Swiss-Prot record:
Protein name according to UniProt: Large ribosomal subunit protein uL22
GO biological process annotation, one example: translation
Subunit annotation: Part of the 50S ribosomal subunit.
GO cellular component, one term: cytosolic large ribosomal subunit
Gene3D superfamilies membership: Ribosomal protein L22/L17
Keyword Secreted among UniProt keywords: no
Entry-linked PANTHER family: CHLOROPLAST 50S RIBOSOMAL PROTEIN L22-RELATED (PTHR13501), LARGE RIBOSOMAL SUBUNIT PROTEIN UL22M (PTHR13501:SF8)
One Pfam family this sequence matches: Ribosomal_L22
Molecular function in Gene Ontology: rRNA binding; structural constituent of ribosome
Domain of life: Bacteria
UniProt function note: This protein binds specifically to 23S rRNA; its binding is stimulated by other ribosomal proteins, e.g. L4, L17, and L20. It is important during the early stages of 50S assembly. It makes multiple contacts with different domains of the 23S rRNA in the assembled 50S subunit and ribosome. The globular domain of the protein is located near the polypeptide exit tunnel on the outside of the subunit, while an extended beta-hairpin is found that lines the wall of the exit tunnel in the center of the 70S ribosome.
Amino acid sequence: MRAEYKNMKSSVQKVNLVADMIRGKGVDVARSQLLFLKKALAKPLSKVLMSSVANAQNNFGVDPDNLYVKEVFVGKGMSLKRFAARARGRSASIRKHYSNVSILLGVLDGSKG
């Protein structure tokens, strides 16, 4: 019960700020937090979360009410190298960072909640 988003246009540190908010929470709580969060990364992470819920529902037949966010992996993706003009005919390199995100869901037991 996993979904991935490869090469999200943001750095790992920025994605981790949002990912820390949903780790270990129920799917409905995590989705509502992402829905009302005023960060640009909340929308793509919400889509990945709902994709993993759909994978759990369609592939494993699990009830979405019994799911929680077990793990959120945020890793370094590709980085584009660009160059900007500087004074005296020089140039400076600019790196545009990307991230890979993977959300793993677990099934709630009676003891967990």
